[in-house]
A protein has these predicted regions:
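Conserved ATP-binding TGD loop and adjacent catalytic N/P-domain core of P-type ATPases
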Residues: 16, 29, 270, 434, ...
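Flexible metal-binding regulatory segments at protein termini and peripheral loops
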Residues: 1-128, 153, 226, 235, ...
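P-type ATPase nucleotide-binding
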Residues: 452, 456-584, 596, 608-624
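Conserved cytosolic catalytic loops of P-type ATPases
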Residues: 26-49, 202-203, 234-328, 425-470, ...
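Juxtamembrane coupling segments of multi-pass membrane pumps/enzymes
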Residues: 184-188, 194, 209-270, 301, ...
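Transmembrane helix-loop-helix hairpins at the membrane interface
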Residues: 89-243, 354, 455, 721-723, ...
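Hydrophobic alpha-helical transmembrane segments
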Residues: 138-147, 154-157, 171, 194, ...
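Membrane-embedded alpha-helical bundles of multi-pass transporters
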Residues: 113-127, 156, 175, 414, ...
Length: 858
């Protein structure tokens, strides 16, 4: 996506105009314009010259963003681009405007209303009073000429905007007041004191100046608040190191960060920031990675561990090799991700975009009609104009245009601070609508690396003897489980002796000689070919297997020496994270390639709602497809084989420590690799959506109430609106919307206080996917295996509570072909386990006899 800076935009109508103009350029496939960041993202084959020309023809300015702006080495340039230059300019304009406005108000209202003294030469000189007011109002208009330049330019190009409304309102007040001044002068020449007083009451010079000043107040507050929405992005950019200490020819040399190349060796002392991504060659230390992950607890680093740019070396001296530099560093990628997300639009923004396209022309039409109607009702032109001007200046398309992007920007920034990165505005919106979360087991629910959990030595054998022998035998094996045994022996500082005649045997077994004694290891089936298992150990091993652990049997000299259990253990925060998801009304499904028995054990420990076992790597995408029939699905994974499922899901969530392929395929990236960040991400999305709805509500309600009030519809009830108060209301509307969005910065992502509570069904194994992996996508999703003859899923409407579930369950299980029915009113599903074929109509009739409606059977 090519990025451009856009100038001259003042409201949502402007951004809609630019977007519409660029989309008409041949070769442009998509265009997204951000009023908040005054930027534009364009995809397609169109040339930059054609795009810039289209923007200029629409009446705005544009320039390509520096291609290197996303590089960490040029973070200072990017930071400079985000600097708030608008607020100081508006502040200077406001101070100047206020100075002249106060003098104008003194002349126009102070003497008449409060008897404030005036220079004696103004006594009875009404023309002089009028000329002073004209001059002062004219000066305020010159100070705020930008409203007139942008407003009338937009009107000429057929794209009126907020500035057009302000310019028309202020100009109408000024022109009418100027006419009244000339008419009053003529009346004074003619000696008609009554007409002189009449026309003096028609002066609206103070309104012309007050409108501009109040709108400038609102613009300044809005600009200041908008500047705060990019604080998170600016703080990320400030983290980018400026220099690095390289080792060249045996000497340390300090160079600019832009000069660091991949493969360079750099050193980092305690207290220094790591300059680029790299791998530790020498030294140990604790590194604070909170800048990237939001996690304040330091992470221990040793030789071979990866380090990231902008993290802080806290304790030891590190010598590292650069692996990612410039725009490839983790920090640069995070900055780019947050920036790109700000340049995209959420689907919900289409509401405001649609309204903004016709809002300003509609307001101008309403103002004209209002003026004409009051004239036809017999009121004077000045009175009718006041009503029309009030309509112009109270209407605010800005609030509509800012309702969505400011909330998206703040939400994205808050997520980035906590190590949760949303790639687009659409993904931030979609995450909050999640109804089902599918979790890959390995590396997501579990640690992803097996470790020894139990040591069961046989009678007469110690744990140390068993582990020493096991390590000696497994030291020659490349199996993943062997590494777990070796790691446990190393952690206990055991030294394993050398073995000879090592062999990996068919049937998952190992054999070797240790000091002339035959030793062997393997699963239960293999070990029973060599010896007889003691009943007690066999029973214990069976219990371990039921818990999802893998028992490894070790023997020697014809007798069993013991059993070592190995398992991929559940992450400490996984059960709590899953419980939080369930309390948010989300169904949690675990996907795994393990056998059903192991999968069920892990599922029970984790507390998931459903377990789908036997899923081959290429079958995850099919499972996600099936789950989508029940609702919006978020897939959480970390491996290459998760990429198709992450892409297929409504929201793909990648664990940050996973593969680059998985991260590329995902919509959301969790830098912390903690499952507890999944409910936090959904919580943040829901809070952002709530904030957007609040903003849109107030923006619409403000205009729905304000425009009729300004037009005079409530005058019969004693309610009227002066143009000055209309301008004040308009100036505050955008400020209120932006301020409401900034409240998101106070939101606690990990607090469960506002979670929607719901009864969470107990963990239950659902189906084996062993056969399902072989099916094509077009086939029905019933799954048949030896243990699970057939399952069907019914979509049921009308269930509201646990009693409804019980009625449907009882009706289905009364059928002789149904062994079990798992019914959930939250998901609106009934999953039946069958022992024989049964027609769909039979199942449907059984449910509908209980006054519920079956909409689909799969």
């Amino acid at each position: 996506m090519e990025q451009y800076n856009v100038t001259g935009m003042s409201c949502a109508a402007c951004s809609a105009r630019v977007e519409k103009a660029v989309k008409k350029v041949p070769g442009v496939t998509s265009c997204s314009v951000s009023l908040l960041t005054n930027s534009m993202g364009v995809e397609g084959t169109a040339s930059p010259a054609a795009i810039l020309s289209a923007v200029q023809e629409a009446g705005y300015g544009a320039s390509p963003k520096n291609a290197s702006a996303s590089k960490a080495s040029d973070a200072s340039a990017d930071l400079d681009a985000l600097a708030d230059r608008e607020t100081p300019k508006l502040k200077r304009r406001l101070i100047a405007s206020l100075g002249f406005l106060l003098v104008l108000m003194y002349f126009s209202m102070g003497h008449m209303m409060w008897g404030w003294p005036l220079p004696h030469w103004f006594d009875g000189n009404h023309v002089a009073m009028g000329l002073v007011q004209l001059l002062l109002a004219g000066i305020v208009m010159v100070i705020n000429q930008k409203f007139f330049i942008n407003g009338f330019k937009g009107l000429i190009h057929g794209a009126p905007n907020m500035d057009t409304l302000v310019a028309l309102g202020s100009m109408a007040s000024f022109v009418w007041s100027t006419y009244a001044l000339f008419a009053m002068t003529r009346a004074q020449v003619d000696g008609s004191d009554e007409l002189v007083m009449h026309y003096m009451m028609e002066f609206y010079f103070e309104s012309a100046a007050m409108i501009l000043t109040l709108i400038t107040v609102g613009k300044m507050l809005e600009a200041r608040s908008k500047g705060k929405t990019t604080d998170a992005l600016k703080s990320l950019m400030k983290l980018a190191p400026k220099t690095a200490t390289l080792v060249r020819d045996g000497a340390e040399v300090t160079v600019a960060i832009a000069d660091v190349q991949k493969g360079d060796v750099f050193v980092v002392r305690p207290g220094e920031n790591i300059p680029v991504d790299g791998v530790v060659l020498e030294g140990t230390s604790a590194v604070n990675e909170s800048a990237l992950t939001g996690e304040s607890i330091p992470v221990d680093k040793a030789v071979g561990d990866k380090v990231s740019a902008a993290t802080t070396n806290q304790s030891g001296f590190l010598r590292c090799e650069a692996t990612r530099v410039g725009e490839d560093t983790t920090l640069a990628q995070i900055i780019k991700m947050v920036s790109d997300a700000a340049a995209t639009k959420a689907p919900i923004a289409k509401i405001a975009d649609t309204v903004s396209g016709f809002f300003v022309p509609a307001v101008i039409s309403i103002a004209v009609v209002t003026t004409i109607v009051w004239l036809l009702l017999g009121h004077e032109l000045g009175y009718a104009l006041a009503r029309g001007i009030s309509v112009l200046v109270i209407s605010c398309p800005c609030a509509l245009g800012l309702a969505t992007p400011v909330a998206i920007m703040v939400g994205n920034g808050l997520g980035a601070k906590n190590g949760i990165l949303f790639k687009t505005a659409a993904s931030l919106e979609a995450a909050g609508r999640t109804q089902i979360v599918a979790l890959d087991k390995t590396g997501t629910i579990t640690e992803g690396a097996p470790r020894v959990t139990d040591l069961l030595p046989a009678e007469g054998v110690t744990e140390t003897e068993l582990l020493t022998l096991a390590a000696a035998l497994e030291s020659r094996s490349e199996h993943l489980l062997a590494k777990a045994v070796l790691a446990d022996a190393e952690a206990k500082a055991l030294t394993s002796p050398e073995v000879t005649d090592f062999a990996a045997l068919p049937g998952n077994g190992l054999a070797a000689k240790l000091d002339g004694m035959d030793i062997y290891a393997g699963n239960a089936a293999f070990i029973q070919t060599r010896l007889t298992l003691p009943a007690a150990l066999a029973q214990q091993a069976e219990k371990l297997a039921a818990e999802g652990k893998t028992p490894l049997f070790f023997g020697g000299a014809g007798r069993l020496l013991g059993v070592i259990a190995v398992a991929d253990t559940i992450k400490e925060d996984s059960p709590e994270a899953i419980r939080q998801l369930q309390n948010m009304g989300i169904r949690v499904v675990m996907l795994t390639g393990d056998n059903q028995r192991t999968a069920d054990a892990i599922g029970r420990q984790a507390g998931v709602d459903e377990v789908i076992a036997g899923v081959l790597p290429d079958g995850k995408e099919t499972v996600i497809r099936q789950l989508q029939a029940s609702g919006k699905v978020a897939m959480v994974g970390d491996g290459i084989n998760d990429a198709p499922a992450l892409t297929r899901a409504d929201t793909g969530i990648a664990i940050g420590a996973g593969t680059d392929v998985a991260i590329d395929a995902a919509d959301v990236v969790l830098m912390n690799s903690k499952l507890s960040d999944v409910p936090a991400a959904i919580r943040l999305s829901r809070a952002t959506l709530r904030n957007i709805h609040e903003n849109l509500f107030w923006a619409f309600i403000y205009n729905i109430i304000g425009i009729p009030l300004a037009a005079g519809l409530f005058i019969p009830f004693g309610l009227t609106l002066n143009p000055m108060f209309g301008a004040a209301a308009m100036s505050l509307s955008s400020f209120c919307v932006v301020s409401n969005a900034l409240r998101l910065n106070l939101f606690d992502l990990h607090s469960t206080r506002h979670d929607h509570k719901t009864a969470s069904p107990a963990a239950a194994p659902v189906q084996s996917a062993a056969e399902n992996n072989k099916k094509s996508d077009a086939e029905a999703p019933e799954v048949k295996t030896e243990d699970n003859p057939m399952k069907k899923t019914l979509k049921v409407e009308g269930m509201m509570c646990g009693h409804c579930e019980a009625r449907v369950k009882k009706a289905l299980e009364a059928l002789p072909e149904v062994d079990e029915a798992v019914v959930r009113h939250e998901a609106g599903t009934a999953i039946v386990t069958l022992n024989a074929e049964v027609a769909d109509d039979v199942l449907k009739n059984a449910v509908e006899a209980q006054d519920y409606k079956v909409t689909d059977i799969q």
